[in-house]
Amino acid sequence: MNLENNMSKMTFCISTLNNNNYLQLAIKSVRENSHFKDAPFVIYAENCTDGTNEWLEENKDKYNLEVYIETDNNPKRGIGGGMNFCASKVKTEFINFLQADIYVAKDWDLELLKLHEKYVGKDRGIVFSQRVQPDIFNDSERAGTIFVPMEEFGEYYHNFDEKYFLEFCAEFRKLNKFTVRKGEGVSGLIRKEDWDYIGGNDDRFAPAYCEDMDLFIRMQNEGFKFMLTSESLIYHFASRASRFPDDDLTKRPQELSDVEQ
């Protein structure tokens, strides 16, 4: 297929709960740095109390967003259920899932399509972006994720250096040309048909956030192909996905109801 002219081949999808500042940065990066800048973009906001709903209503036309807001879910759908909700609204061939606390580099979406065409083709499969993440937990390096000092690009939305990160990504792509057979649960491109076939996330895990492990096991058992590429890069603010409230890395939520997506 002609990848260059298929802006409606995919739909970007984000499910969020109280990630307003990071969500704004994520949406901005998708619209500015994606190859398919005008592709459909579904946002699902659940039980948000931090101004997310108001910001989405005010900016949905500016960013051409398809916005869905639920304010009093009990029990909550959680991130897995939110992904399922977003997927149910997709009308394009591909779904491109993102978390709310990411920043995407140039042409990340086009490179995922290229990877899918090359390694998955007509089979069932899902492809992923190389992740760059601030080293909040003193993690060990692993395939698919580069841990950098927290001050390298910034660990928060308010001190993130967009220009420096994009320069790093351009240089990284020049020096690294690799694919890895694995999944990373941040940015995943999958055919809508394949998502429906596997049944999406299992709601028995809601509203917790371990559902991707179960999803990947089911995909593996069904013969799905997994592949990750160095050509598609994203920054993942682990401070939010790791459930640190209010950007304070010294605190953790005490109640299940405080868990944020």
Could you say what each language-model-derived stretch is?
Residues 19-32:
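Short, well-formed alpha-helical segments that are part of the catalytic scaffolds
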Residues 45-54:
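A conserved acidic beta->alpha catalytic loop
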Residues 72-90:
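Glycine-rich, basic loop-to-helix element that forms the pyrophosphate-binding segment
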Residues 95:
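Short aromatic/hydrophobic "clamp" motif used to bind/position activated sugar donors
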Residues 109-125:
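Conserved donor-nucleotide/metal-binding helix-loop-beta segment in metal-dependent transferases, i.e.
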Residues 127-147:
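Short beta-strand-to-loop element that shapes/binds the nucleotide-sugar donor at the catalytic cleft/hinge
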Residues 155-159, 165-190:
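A recurrent flexible, glycine/aromatic-enriched loop bordering the glycosyltransferase active site
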Residues 181-190, 194-199, 205-232:
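A short, conserved alpha-helix in the catalytic core of glycosyltransferases
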